[in-house]
Amino acid sequence: VYDASGDIVTNDHVVGTDTQFKVTFADGRTLDATLVGADPADDLAVIKVAGTNLPAGAMFADSKQVKVGEICLAIGNPLGLASSVTDGIVSFNGRTVNEGNGVVLSSTIQTSAPINPGNSGGALVDLRGEVIGIPTLAATDPQLGGGAAGGIGFAIPSNTIKRIADQLVRTGQITNSGRAALGITAANANGPQGQPVGVLVHSVIAASAAAQAGISVGDVITQINGTPTPDVSALADLLAALYPNDQVKVAVTHPNGTTSSYDVTLGKLG
């Protein structure tokens, strides 16, 4: 519960394409709710309950102050087991993870608290009961056939939750994503043997960071700040860890085979 007005924050992948919901509270009441707004890029959504005498909103900690080693509790409905609580520690604060569906989450809190289907959209809290994150996904292990890797889960940090939820509650949409953007549409570029070699620029948005730096359609982005960008996913991972107005060096290969390095001041997504 985000506030006493009936706003509830959860994961975008939990609400999916639905706009109408049923919400069951701890006192046993089940009330109707509607979608307020969603932010797929950060995997967050807000729904609103219609009713009176609603619970007060949760208290949110400053996720930047969360320390590795702190004990934390994951609260949710794993495997349909309502109001379950699991414990663990904060394993890392500030991890960038790829959900595998085009969504790259930055600054996540990695935790050893077990995260199972049904935990998504719940709460990760500290021992003061303050929300430090929303459990969102667990790591998978290819050696386990894609099964969950025990003790490695990720939560969207409370500071991101507050920044995004405040905008959704206020306007139903995101007006300040806080995410860095180059201002291009792109696709994977492959070499003669099909190997990934970079990110092909399909289009450049007028007046965007890329346009102002001189990046053109047909260029292939190969590095950001010296880190290779073999494909779109790698580029997205790097951008997710950066912020608007950050200055970066972008290495490109032009259609004629020559190379250039551009100083780019990143723009803002959304």
Residue ranges and their predicted role:
Residues S260-Y262:
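Extracellular and select intracellular beta-sandwich modules with Ser/Thr-enriched
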